[in-house]
From Swiss-Prot:
This is DNA damage-regulated autophagy modulator protein 1. Lysosomal modulator of autophagy that plays a central role in p53/TP53-mediated apoptosis. Signal peptide: none annotated. It comes from the Eukaryota. It comes from Xenopus tropicalis (Western clawed frog). It is found in: Lysosome membrane. Disulfide bonds: none annotated. The gene is dram1. GO terms for cellular component: lysosomal membrane. The chain crosses the membrane at residues 15-35, 54-74, 98-118, 119-139, 162-182, 201-221.
Length: 239
């Protein structure tokens, strides 16, 4: 009997959450043990700036971006099929949500590729795209969940998704503002440093948003359990 989180296409959000969480935690543990960052509380990107943890961070976050794109596209196709049956949503709404989500995944790839201290402007742009598009995506998905309730979602699931979305939305604002107010980029933050409290608040909010995304994708598992993914292959003899 397969694990409940592997039924149907549920393996996609399950692997996404496990892999992403492991990517954050592994790079954090390595960077703290080596002494590259203080244990409380670095930015997520700070834990993937210096080698060897930068290699772990880049590899795992790049794969997370691809898993995220695959999960979002599957979610898009599920909603498309459901909408054909009950017509609860304008077609463009689903496409807009997918486009925003995929843009966030591209931002994630930029974060993984361009390290914080090496190319800060590009890295920061990628991070901003990731978090803003990610929050917009889960807000749109929460709205869609309410529109599809009770035919395709329970009211409890809708409330959980909206609660996570609101928390992420609230956290992403101070994350961005206090990041600017904290001043210059550095890895070795100390409580006596100017701007430390801004940095601390921003970093805590960043972790809240990041794991908020993971918690949100966990709620997709139930929806994906009744779905199968098929690959169709055709050979054109005149090619």
């Amino acid at each position: 009997m397969p694990c409940w989180c592997l039924h149907g296409a549920a393996f996609l959000p399950s692997i996404l959450v496990i892999w992403s969480s492991a990517g954050f935690l592994f790079s954090y543990i390595i960077s703290v043990l080596i002494g590259h960052v203080p244990p409380f509380v670095p930015y997520i990107s700070d834990t993937g700036t210096s080698p060897p943890e930068s290699g772990v961070f880049g590899f795992m976050i790049s794969l997370s971006a691809m898993l995220g794109a695959a999960t979002m596209y599957t979610r898009y196709k599920i909603l498309e099929k459901q909408n054909h049956s009950t017509d609860f949503l304008p077609y463009y709404f689903n496409k807009t949500s997918l486009a925003i989500g995929l843009l966030g995944c591209i931002g994630m790839g930029i974060v993984a590729t361009f390290q914080e201290m090496a190319v800060p402007a590009v890295h920061d742009a990628g991070a901003l795209i990731t978090f803003i598009c990610g929050v917009l995506y889960i807000l749109l998905q929460s709205y869609i969940s309410y529109k599809s309730c009770p035919a395709w979602n329970t009211r409890v699931t809708c409330h959980i998704r909206m609660a996570i979305s609101v928390i992420a939305f609230i956290a992403v604002v101070p994350m961005s503002v206090f990041s600017v107010l904290s001043g210059r980029k550095r890895l070795d933050w100390k409580p006596s440093d100017e701007g430390y409290h801004y940095h601390l608040t921003s970093a805590i909010c960043e972790w809240i948003v990041a794991f908020g995304f993971n918690m949100y994708f966990l709620t997709f598992i139930r929806d994906f359990q009744g779905v199968s993914i098929q690959i169709s292959t055709e050979i054109h003899e005149d090619f």
